[in-house]
Amino acid sequence: MVNFTVDQIRAIMDKKANIRNMSVIAHVDHGKSTLTDSLVCKAGIIASARAGETRFTDTRKDEQERCITIKSTAISLFYELSENDLNFIKQSKDGSGFLINLIDSPGHVDFSSEVTAALRVTDGALVVVDCVSGVCVQTETVLRQAIAERIKPVLMMNKMDRALLELQLEPEELYQTFQRIVENVNVIISTYGEGESGPMGNIMIDPVLGTVGFGSGLHGWAFTLKQFAEMYVAKFAAKGEGQLSAAERAKKVEDMMKKLWGDRYFDPANGKFSKSANSPDGKKLPRTFCQLILDPIFKVFDAIMNFRKEETAKLIEKLDIKLDSEDKDKEGKPLLKAVMRRWLPAGDALLQMITIHLPSPVTAQKYRCELLYEGPPDDEAAMGIKSCDPKGPLMMYISKMVPTSDKGRFYAFGRVFSGVVSTGLKVRIMGPNYTPGKKEDLYLKPIQRTILMMGRYVEPIEDVPCGNIVGLVGVDQFLVKTGTITTFEHAHNMRVMKFSVSPVVRVAVEAKNPADLPKLVEGLKRLAKSDPMVQCIIEESGEHIIAGAGELHLEICLKDLEEDHACIPIKKSDPVVSYRETVSEESNVLCLSKSPNKHNRLYMKARPFPDGLAEDIDKGEVSARQELKARARYLAEKYEWDVAEARKIWCFGPDGTGPNILTDITKGVQYLNEIKDSVVAGFQWATKEGALCEENMRGVRFDVHDVTLHADAIHRGGGQIIPTARRCLYASVLTAQPRLMEPIYLVEIQCPEQVVGGIYGVLNRKRGHVFEESQVAGTPMFVVKAYLPVNESFGFTADLRSNTGGQAFPQCVFDHWQILPGDPFDNSSRPSQVVAETRKRKGLKEGIPALDNFLDKL
């Protein structure tokens, strides 16, 4: 079954220059899993006849049934490059065998957290684009994430069989399509990348360099310009050139590749390349890419699909393709598959592109270290990561948990960045909240076993050196979702992953049979472990809430909960959307609150953030961990804050990182530092449960204007200050025109021209609005982009399909928060209904609490 053993893999793991860690990323249904099959079959794990149909990496039953990838799966492949190909590799290498750790990731936007987890442990990405529908919204999202993590992309144009058989494009049109996709991808790379002067150098993709592949995953064939350049170099070589050395030959092939793309033309009359589109006698010349590459492919397709036997036989002989006896009797599509697969095998083309152009851990960790590691850039751990040193201290990042066949236990899945991880090694397990020098979120435990992940199987392995991807057994009890594993006692954490979506849709769950409650609680804990994104919360009313990224994500989570994690029947509520509370202008009075013993007074005001600041905090451009002066400068330059105020930010909230700020603009208050912690605690409490309906606050800046304190320390303890601070914060919100914010999806809808009207109808009913509409060049498809409130998105897909005759395909991504128009105090408005519903659901008193509860008189 497998052509190579664990021992062989283990031997090659030490050659860190010959390891490639890569993930396959793309828009939903552009053919990632199908393509991965051709790679897997090349490495001899599935029979080549079944490649393209097996979807080996879709390991779960529901993935096979729905034909979508839900969880990212990892697989290790072994590939050997020939002498000639080794000369194309520009980085250091060690022997001709390569170990490729491949992670197939989901394309569905609801699972984009899985993609983030996959990207963290890889250095390169194969971006798959369907050449018929082009670069879509999800392609852009995942590519942006990859570039933010400093991951080098190579491109694969998939589904060429559709372009040839369904759309029947001419060679020149097809070239233009490819050219446009390459341009689109490069625009994304240059927008989010660091430019040529950055640490990675130029990461733009270019067919001439061989970083773009073309082909069809379903039929199992693919090529880069390198394959054709080699054929033509061999064909045009004069008699005396047969003795070229490998290096000279590589040079010739690279020169040839430059002539095969772009505005270069070929004159068939004399076999010369020219740079002008017209020959000397005025004939229009064909483009080299069309004449020398697409033309032979078109001829093969044409001859076989029109059942011209003699012509087919001639072509097969000319292209020197050896068919099996059983393949010779086929005709039509099956024969086409067999011929193309023999002539341009996808596995070879892609694996060569991966080994030649994607970086090894040695290359990549040099420039990725500063993004990965939170600690100082010159301590032992950082040096170990930078040089990918097996003798350095162990540094390993766990990016997700993978459920095992044993109920309730998980493998910790991650990558070793420095040192060696081995069975029985005693390590420090550090969760995301660990800070060096403290004891919380830290465990000292031995690793029970190290294992190798092979898609549906796991293989035990003694030890794994740095640069590799590995699973650990026996760590799952100490980590929730992610964490750092190390042997270096002064190590800082590896940086937490930033998710591009946020969990905004929630359902309440309860056990159908109340006696099953303990099982439900246990199941929720396991669910929180197994999915990087999902949040499980217990409300004060005792309700169990699951929050996810969208309908599909929640559906899968609930199914997992019912069948795998809790194994009990479950009742679920309708999905509800979480809101945020904010203010729309500055407080109209200076708010005063007195402490319960009447000896301390706080004076505060609230005001809204300038546009864009809340988003900056979400992205981490502005954060609590930043250096103080740098942060003050940024706020002063970009948002015109007063520098003195910007330096006196006490904290961010909720949870110390959220998009609300508490600043101290008092002048000369005695004992202020003693109550700082208490005020901050009150602020965290108030921003987590706002005044309107106990939802999180967002985009509010609170200013402490003045504080009068009792001279005796005993009269100004936490019990006096914390509730006072909270009351004062609530008062300042209620006097500053409070508003509700709702989450908004960005919807991208692909559809034929004639049903665009139906889409507008559905969106208008759902309070959505279209902000961009464009035609995909060269196809009759339209792309409509619109904003749609998450609250209205339930059943949107079904509604859309029924109004467009099933021809429109929506993709929803959480995009931003937007203020719900209307005043929550006006009983007829939309926000006041939402507040009433939310308060009722949470079991709070009816109606927004009156201002008198919080505001005191002098």
From Swiss-Prot:
Keywords of this entry: Acetylation, Cytoplasm, Elongation factor, GTP-binding, Hydrolase, Isopeptide bond, Methylation, Nucleotide-binding, Nucleus, Phosphoprotein, Protein biosynthesis, Ubl conjugation
SUPFAM superfamilies from the UniProt entry: EF-G C-terminal domain-like (SSF54980), P-loop containing nucleoside triphosphate hydrolases (SSF52540), Ribosomal protein S5 domain 2-like (SSF54211), Translation proteins (SSF50447)
Record PTM: Phosphorylation by EF-2 kinase completely inactivates EF-2; it requires prior phosphorylation by CDK2 at Ser-595 during mitotic prometaphase. Phosphorylation by CSK promotes SUMOylation, proteolytic cleavage, and nuclear translocation if the C-terminal fragment. Diphthamide is 2-[3-carboxyamido-3-(trimethyl-ammonio)propyl]histidine.
Molecular functions (GO terms): 5S rRNA binding; actin filament binding; GTP binding; GTPase activity; lncRNA binding; p53 binding; protein kinase binding; ribosome binding
Enzymatic reactions: GTP + H2O = GDP + phosphate + H(+)
GO biological process assignments: cellular response to brain-derived neurotrophic factor stimulus; glial cell proliferation; hematopoietic progenitor cell differentiation; positive regulation of cytoplasmic translation; response to endoplasmic reticulum stress; response to estradiol; response to ethanol; response to folic acid
Residues with PTM Phosphothreonine: 54, 57, 59, 435
Annotated residues for binding of GTP: 26-33, 158-161, 216-218
Positions of post-translational Diphthamide modification: 715
InterPro entries: EFG_II (IPR041095), EFG_III/V (IPR035647), EFG_V-like (IPR000640), EFTu-like_2 (IPR004161), G_TR_CS (IPR031157), P-loop_NTPase (IPR027417), Ribosomal_Su5_D2-typ_SF (IPR020568), Ribsml_uS5_D2-typ_fold_subgr (IPR014721)
Modified residues (N6,N6,N6-trimethyllysine): 525
Modification type N6-succinyllysine: residues: 152, 272, 572
Protein name according to UniProt: Elongation factor 2
Organism: Mus musculus
